[in-house]
Amino acid sequence: MSSPPARGARSSLWARVGRHWSLVAGALLALIAAGDDLGGAPAKPTSEFHFVRMFYHDGAYGRSYRGFDRSWTTDYPEAEFHFHLGVSRLTRVDIGEQARMLRVTDDAIFDYPWLYAVEVGRWHLDDTEAARLREYLDRGGFFMVDDFHGTLQWEGFVESMQRVFPDRPIVEISEGDEVFHVLYELNQRIQIPGIAALMSGRTYEQDGVTPHWRGIYDDHGRLMVAINFNMDLGDAWEHADDPRYPEPMTNLAYRFAVNYVVYAMTH
């Protein structure tokens, strides 16, 4: 791994992050005020696949911006933009240019086969939301979770996930599982880190030293929930055009994403 950027480069990056969040927050507030996806009638699908980001409320360890929880917005919108470019170039999937942001309680969620949530160590699902997510998954939906790290955040994730599936275990996805071979042969298991961790000379955050690919399956062996624990694929997509982020890790993050998409669309 290359050495971390100099202090000036770090300061420049964090200044950019601050400016970026101000722009993102303004865009999200405008969407909410306009009732687009988060308030009024959500937009209908225009393609066979859309990137759908799950809106959720933070739990005890969450953050907020002017009253709006914001853990769920991490890496938005650059992650979506680069995800779209990657899937478009690497597959023949008809992917919509416009990503979606939906509450799990929105009926429109059933129009989309693939759902993404980030920083789920901070989320909190009430009983209504948990029941709706269970229904979505039981009816064939696919749920990818990403960018949460360490013991405390794992416990936060499991607390809400057990409301969704109190009767289904979370297990390690085996190397022979179809999801790792449906398009790309994903035999390489390396930790895909966030850029902030890389800048500090590590590939992990908190005490999340070991990466895990875990999942929840239905009664027929279909993977319903893909759990990327102690990893940050969203950062790898977001920084795909940043020379400071290692290209091999970006490439691997894209391959995992493409396999998840193809699996979701065919199972």
Protein language model annotation of sequence segments:
Residues F51, I109, W114-W154:
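Short alpha-beta junction capping motif
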Residues G59-G67, Q153-G234, E238-H239, M249, ...:
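An acidic, glycine-rich "communication" segment
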Residues S22-A33:
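Bacterial N-terminal signal peptides
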Residues V93-R103, V145-F148, R168-G176:
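Surface-exposed patches in mature extracellular/periplasmic domains of secreted proteins
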Residues A79, F83, E129-R132, Q153, ...:
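Stable alpha-helical elements in mature extracytoplasmic
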Residues G35-W114, V118-G121, M224, D232-H267:
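Aromatic-Pro/Gly-enriched surface loop or interdomain linker
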